[in-house]
């Protein structure tokens, strides 16, 4: 049956049948969501907060233009004073009395206006408090809720969906995109309403006070709107374009950091850095274009705003003289119109940042909400489907056909028919990639078949509740997946939903899996933390814990996919017996390459290219002498051994092992008395942290200086632009007061004098010039500084990744440096640096420029008033400082909590099939939600305090006008000359007021600008924390430096490896000595083998040769050179490594093989094909539709275990290494492939030193020397036959593995 892509629909995004979700999906087509959709997850409480926050924002926005009415009234008070002098001319009082009367009248009126200004200030404080606290709480709550929903949605998705998405892309959404959504709902969203309300109120006041003057000012409004629309479009388009390369960069980072050992062993650090840099630079390219677009739009907008003011200034003299459309217009009215309209249009100039942030949030929400909305066909959260009262375990495959969603043209199963009866044990055998593991996945319903059906007890499993189905199944996979935490937690994860096994039951399962003994000997026993993915355990130890986890489930169906592949022979024998016991009374399906483990199966099915070609019991198939017979014969050893002899030897072996265990226990007891090494390791760690803390003292200046150093042209122009933009408003205010002073002396029906006309024209021309300067300044300060900031963030992100790849393996072993935590830092910390990037530095420069010029001008015109107002600044600064400190205190624990969330996220996404097979979606969802409680508690603790300090700052800033006018009138009353003629007295009042108004308006622009620092401080607090986190890693100098150019190199490398009295402890487990004085030699061109029980230290020797770690004492030599003295890349380039768990990267087959090529070496396609042929990989690669260009999926998910292993072998062989390290290199291969690959490896070993770690002794019987390791010591050594003749440990292992094979 041919399956076309159009027919394959089960993995497409499936809309929710619910009408609401259908509506949502329609609404979000187009790359970003609308405002309503952005807040779709807001509950009643959050909606109330949103409404109150919007009201507060509108209040803050309205009060500033309304304050201009009072300011205009102040001006008109002086104009009225002049009128009063004319009216009082007929009254017979002395000139001095008249002057006092005029002054007192003005003073009384202004004092009343000052009181009203104070009421406005209090209103602004209340509105500001509501705005801050509501949006702070709203954004934090929504961020936590969306993180939780997204994580839950990921847990819900089917494996087919994950096959089509890279882990890095998914994790970047929760780390980066949700932060953008949160920013879009924060106070920055409130600023949108603040600016729009300010805009509307300002123009409304203008039309009410003087409609014709406002219309003249509005002439430029269409141009302002076009500039603003261009700004918004630039932000939206380039934000969307930057998303794809950034996600791809995150994917590269997550893959490489998660597989750092493989990256180091292949010396591919620089290559991956180049790939990462390419994606980040592509992201930077779009972000820089966005910045230039925003800067250009904002510069043009400011020019048109100033031009409109120039037009208004020119027309102002007509309306005051009664020649306009409005009647009774005074200078104060002109001032009110101008200032309110100026504030309205100026508010638009501040809208770029919130619009940019909102656009980013809407684009990010589109990506995140799509995942949350998606309801898969295979929905593990569904409550639908049958839940039978019992499960008998009768399984049937009926004409099942299947293709994977990412390889639609490759048929994995072709009409599979198979019946498995209750309680039967069925074995599936065959070559790698023939479909065995696929059948296991179909039984769990990880995928649905494209044709036919799978039934359980006669019911199609698609009709069963999926949680109920998976609850009946226990699975032990080919590559054991454990989770960061304790051994106890990992075993307990196997328990059925709602069940709580006792301690005794858990220990019994561990004993059945032959895990109890090694667990008991660990310092913390079952409470031992095993590290990320169980990194602190050997492969065999992980496998045994996974088996214990499956057994504690007591399932009706047991699925064993190469369950004992990673075990040593002794453990395999014991565990196999346990599994056979566990299989009784339940249906068991075994996938195995070691055919000794399936002899007792009720039925053995031989697969070939997706079809069963033979089936029957072991002896029936042996008698058939077909494919199965050939597979068995290939695995048989030549020796035939009497079973009774084997049992006696096993007994003897166990007795000897018990004695060895007793000795080890004594050694471990002695370890507690030998604390010098442990103390040394811990002391080194403390000193490292102390150095890093010292280097963090000047981190803020380092970030700023590093940015300026690399972008000095952009930054210099931005610096000049920032100063120009900051100076524009004080000088505009100065010029505007001169204009108002002229208008105050105009009267209806009176023509302009030449001096007045020239003065008005000069003011208009100055405003035009300020507009041109402002346009250029804003382009430089916003556009170029923002572009420099984006380049800085990109550069630091690249350097940060480079430094992470720089770290030695032991650094990644630390709990705080797990993959999720490190990728979270890499994604979020550089983004947080925007708080101290060039853009923010530009904001601060503009603010300080405004403050400097404002107070400079103020001091020149009224030094007393300026100094009195300046005295308020320390109080404002104090509250700003407190606000910044509170922001830092809030940000630090939240940052740590989100990093821990990142750890859980990456861990779960990478192991999603295991999580879903265990049915532990709710467990991990709860664990993730528990991590989110820390930032949630911070909201309640810090939100009110932040809002109060911010509100007090607003109160003080808003009160400056009232304070200034009150002081100004007091100074005038004391300094003015009352003894002159009334007209001269009035002129002096107006001139003196003009100077005070100049000082006050310029100072007011300074204080308003200074208050904007409060908006910058929260971002600065986050940025400083992020910078410390980044530079902690950048400044760290690892003891094993993979980038180091130092160290010896030499020609004619022979490849002789020698261990001299090696002792070793892992830095994270300093209390446990792994190797205890090991010495051995692998001579040039020879093959040595290391055998022994899981966890005895075999794989550790491989890691020491690769120099992932340095020994605690002793020496590892290459051709007589201590490897510590060799250049690290030179050393690793001499080595080819194939590990126990093959690691491939999410790229094509050919690119994965090329990863083995040392840096600077070119290889042809023919050489790649030759390496693949040697690894027995060429045929299956060529059979795939895309051949060598086939994408292998995230971590090789589109290939079988055996296929991945063969590509990994080809990758090692293409290095043409002098030393070949094979750590269970053929463990995942079927017997046919193993034989071919083993022959290839035997050939490849000629002329090079080969060190083999193997549990299958058949693969190492031809080794030149075999070393038997037990508990970190070599207990036997010799050739295969010598050790067999010795009849010691090795002999017993061999007998235990092969017994009486005919």
From Swiss-Prot:
Gene3D superfamilies: ABC transporter type 1, transmembrane domain, P-loop containing nucleotide triphosphate hydrolases
Keyword Transcription regulation carried by entry: no
Keyword annotations: ATP-binding, Glycoprotein, Membrane, Nucleotide-binding, Repeat, Translocase, Transmembrane, Transmembrane helix, Transport
CDD domains found in the cross-reference section: ABC_6TM_Pgp_ABCB1_D1_like, ABC_6TM_Pgp_ABCB1_D2_like, ABC_MTABC3_MDL1_MDL2
Swiss-Prot/TrEMBL GO biological process terms: transmembrane transport
SUPFAM superfamilies: ABC transporter transmembrane region (SSF90123), P-loop containing nucleoside triphosphate hydrolases (SSF52540)
Recorded catalytic activity of this chain's protein: ATP + H2O + xenobioticSide 1 = ADP + phosphate + xenobioticSide 2
PROSITE patterns membership: ABC_TM1F, ABC_TRANSPORTER_1, ABC_TRANSPORTER_2
Annotated TM spans: 43-63, 118-138, 192-212, 213-233, 292-312, 331-351, 712-732, 765-785, 841-861, 862-882
InterPro entries linked to this entry: AAA+_ATPase (IPR003593), ABC1_TM_dom (IPR011527), ABC1_TM_sf (IPR036640), ABC_transporter-like_ATP-bd (IPR003439), ABC_transporter-like_CS (IPR017871), P-loop_NTPase (IPR027417), Type_1_exporter (IPR039421)
Domain ABC transmembrane type-1: 51-360, 713-1022
Molecular-function annotations in GO: ABC-type transporter activity; ATP binding; ATP hydrolysis activity; ATPase-coupled transmembrane transporter activity
Localisation: Membrane
Keyword ATP-binding carried by entry: yes
EC number(s) stated in the UniProt entry for this protein: 7.6.2.2
Residue ranges of every copy of the ABC transporter domain listed in the record: 395-634, 1057-1296
Glycosylation sites: 83, 663, 751, 808
Record-listed ATP binding positions: 430-437, 1092-1099
Pfam families: ABC_membrane, ABC_tran
Annotated GO CC locations: membrane
Annotated membrane topology: Multi-pass membrane protein
Family recorded in the similarity comment: Belongs to the ABC transporter superfamily. ABCB family. Multidrug resistance exporter (TC 3.A.1.201) subfamily.
Function: Energy-dependent efflux pump responsible for decreased drug accumulation in multidrug resistance parasites.
Protein name: Multidrug resistance protein 1
């Amino acid at each position: 049956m041919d399956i076309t892509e159009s027919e394959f629909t089960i993995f497409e995004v499936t809309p929710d049948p619910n009408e609401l979700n259908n509506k949502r999906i329609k609404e979000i087509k187009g790359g970003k969501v609308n405002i309503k959709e952005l807040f779709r997850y807001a509950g009643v409480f959050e909606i109330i907060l949103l409404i109150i926050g919007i009201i507060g924002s509108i209040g803050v926005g309205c009060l500033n233009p309304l304050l201009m009415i009072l300011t205009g009234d102040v001006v008109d008070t002086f104009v009225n004073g002049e009128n009063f002098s004319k009216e009082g001319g007929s009254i017979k009082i002395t000139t001095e009395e008249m002057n006092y009367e005029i002054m007192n009248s003005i003073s009384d009126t202004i004092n009343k206006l000052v009181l009203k200004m104070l009421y406005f200030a209090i209103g602004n404080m209340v509105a500001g408090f509501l705005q801050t606290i509501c949006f702070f709480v709203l954004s934090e709550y929504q961020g936590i809720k969306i993180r939780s929903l997204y994580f839950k949605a990921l847990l819900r998705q089917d494996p087919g969906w994950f096959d089509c998405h890279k882990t890095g892309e998914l994790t970047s959404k929760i780390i980066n995109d949700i932060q953008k959504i949160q920013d879009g709902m924060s106070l920055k969203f409130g600023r949108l309403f603040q600016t729009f309300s300010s805009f509307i109120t300002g123009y409304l006041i203008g039309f009410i006070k003087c409609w014709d003057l406002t219309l003249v000012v509005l002439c430029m409004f269409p141009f302002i709107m076009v500039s603003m629309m261009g700004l918004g479009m630039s932000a939206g388009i380039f934000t969307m374009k930057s998303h794809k390369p950034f996600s791809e960069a995150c994917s590269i980072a997550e893959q490489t950091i998660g597989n750092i050992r493989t990256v180091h062993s292949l010396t591919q650090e620089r290559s991956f850095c180049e790939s990462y840099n390419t994606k980040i630079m592509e992201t930077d390219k779009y972000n820089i274009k966005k910045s230039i677009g925003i800067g250009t739009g904002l510069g043009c907008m400011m020019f048109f705003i100033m031009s409109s003011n120039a037009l208004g200034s020119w027309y102002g003299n007509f309306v005051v003289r009664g020649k306009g459309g409005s009647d009774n217009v005074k200078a104060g009215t002109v001032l009110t119109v101008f200032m309110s309209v100026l504030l309205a249009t100026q508010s638009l100039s501040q809208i770029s940042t919130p619009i940019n942030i909102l656009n980013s949030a809407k684009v990010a929400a589109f990506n995140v909400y799509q995942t949350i909305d998606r309801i898969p066909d295979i929905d593990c959260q569904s409550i639908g489907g049958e839940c039978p009262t019992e499960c008998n375990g009768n399984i049937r495959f009926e004409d099942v056909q299947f293709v994977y969603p990412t390889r639609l043209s490759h048929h994995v199963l072709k009409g599979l028919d198979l019946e498995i009866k209750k309680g039967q044990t069925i074995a599936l055998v065959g070559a790698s990639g023939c479909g065995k593991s696929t059948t296991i996945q179909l039984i769990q319903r990880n995928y649905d078949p494209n044709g036919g059906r799978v039934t359980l007890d006669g019911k199609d499993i698609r009709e069963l509740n999926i949680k109920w189905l998976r609850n009946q199944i226990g699975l032990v996979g080919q590559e054991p997946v454990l989770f960061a935490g304790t051994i106890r937690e990992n075993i307990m994860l196997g328990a059925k939903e709602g069940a709580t096994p006792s301690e005794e039951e858990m220990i019994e399962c561990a004993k059945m899996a032959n895990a109890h003994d090694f667990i008991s000997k660990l310092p913390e026993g079952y409470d031992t933390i095993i590290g990320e993915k169980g990194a602190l355990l050997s492969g065999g130890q992980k496998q045994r814990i996974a088996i214990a986890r499956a057994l504690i489930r007591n399932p009706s169906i047991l699925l064993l996919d190469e369950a004992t592949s990673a075990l040593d022979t002794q453990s395999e024998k014991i565990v196999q017996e346990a599994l056979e016991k566990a299989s009784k009374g339940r249906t068991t399906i075994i996938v195995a390459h070691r055919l000794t483990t399936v002899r007792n199966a009720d039925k053995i099915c031989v697969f070939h290219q997706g079809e069963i070609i033979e089936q029957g019991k072991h002896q029936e198939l042996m008698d058939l002498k077909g494919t199965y017979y050939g597979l068995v014969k290939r695995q048989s050893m030549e020796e035939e051994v009497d079973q009774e002899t084997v049992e006696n030897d096993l007994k003897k072996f166990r007795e000897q092992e018990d004695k060895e265990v007793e000795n080890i226990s004594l050694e471990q007891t002695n370890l507690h008395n030998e604390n010098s090494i442990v103390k040394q390791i811990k002391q080194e760690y403390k000193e490292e942290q102390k150095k890093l803390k010292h280097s963090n003292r000047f981190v803020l200046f380092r970030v700023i200086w590093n940015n300026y150093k690399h972008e000095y042209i952009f930054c210099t122009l931005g610096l000049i632009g920032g100063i120009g933009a900051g100076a524009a408003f004080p000088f505009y205010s100065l010029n505007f007061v001169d204009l108002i002073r002229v208008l105050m002396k105009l009267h209806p029906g009176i023509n302009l004098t030449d001096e007045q006309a020239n003065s008005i024209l000069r003011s208009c021309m100055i405003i035009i010039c300020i507009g041109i300067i402002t346009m250029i300044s804003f382009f430089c300060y916003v556009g170029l500084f923002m572009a420099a900031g984006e380049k800085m963030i990109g550069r630091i992100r690249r350097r940060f990744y480079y430094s992470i790849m720089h770290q030695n393996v032991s650094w990644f072993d630390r709990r705080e440096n797990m993959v999720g935590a490190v990728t979270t830092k890499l994604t979020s910390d550089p983004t947080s640096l925007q708080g101290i990037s060039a853009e923010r530095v530009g904001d601060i420069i503009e603010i300080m420029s405004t403050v400097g010029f404002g107070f400079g001008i103020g001091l020149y015109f009224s030094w007393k008033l300026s100094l009195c107002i300046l005295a308020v600044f320390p109080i404002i600064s104090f509250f700003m400082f407190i606000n910044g400190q509170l922001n830092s205190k809030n940000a630090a624990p939240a940052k740590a909590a989100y990093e821990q969330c990142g750890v859980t996220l990456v861990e779960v996404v990478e192991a999603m099939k295991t999580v879903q097979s265990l049915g532990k979606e709710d467990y991990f969802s709860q664990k993730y939600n528990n991590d989110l409680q820390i930032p949630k508690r911070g909201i309640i603790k810090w939100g009110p305090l932040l809002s109060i300090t911010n509100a007090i700052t607003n109160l003080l800033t808003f009160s400056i006008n009232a304070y200034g006018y009150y002081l100004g009138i007091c100074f005038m009353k004391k300094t003015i000359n009352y003894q002159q003629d009334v007209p001269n007295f009035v002129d002096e009042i107006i001139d003196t007021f003009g100077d005070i108004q100049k000082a006050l308006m310029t100072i007011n622009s300074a204080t308003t600008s200074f208050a904007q620092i409060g908006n910058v401080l929260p971002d600065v607090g986050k940025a400083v924390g992020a910078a410390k986190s980044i530079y902690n890693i950048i400044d760290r100098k690892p003891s094993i430096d993979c980038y180091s150019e130092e160290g010896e190199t030499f020609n004619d490398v022979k490849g002789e490896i020698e261990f001299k009295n090696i002792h070793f402890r892992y830095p994270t487990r300093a209390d446990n000595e792994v190797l205890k004085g090991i010495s051995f030699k692998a001579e040039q061109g020879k093959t040595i083998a290391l055998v022994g029980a899981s966890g005895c230290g075999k794989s550790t020797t491989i890691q020491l040769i690769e120099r992932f770690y340095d020994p605690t004492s002793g020496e590892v030599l290459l051709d007589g050179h201590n490897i510590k003295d060799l250049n690290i890349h030179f050393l690793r380039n001499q080595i080819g490594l194939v590990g126990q768990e093959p690691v491939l990267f999410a790229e094509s087959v050919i690119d994965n093989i090329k990863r083995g090529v040392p840096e600077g070496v070119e290889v042809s396609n023919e050489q790649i094909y030759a390496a693949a042929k040697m690894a027995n990989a060429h045929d299956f690669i060529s059979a795939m539709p895309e051949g060598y260009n086939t994408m292998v999926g995230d971590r090789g998910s589109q290939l079988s275990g055996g296929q991945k292993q063969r590509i990994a072998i080809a990758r090692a062989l293409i290095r043409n290494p002098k030393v070949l390290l094979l750590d269970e290199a053929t463990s995942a291969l079927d017997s046919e492939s193993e034989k071919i690959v083993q022959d290839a490896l035997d050939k490849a070993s000629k002329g090079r030193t080969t060190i083999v770690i193997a549990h299958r002794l058949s693969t190492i019987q031809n080794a030149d020397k075999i070393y038997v390791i037990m508990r970190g010591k070599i207990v036997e050594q010799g050739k295969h036959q010598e050790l067999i003749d010795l009849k010691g440990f090795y002999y017993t292992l061999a007998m235990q593995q092969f017994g009486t094979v005919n």
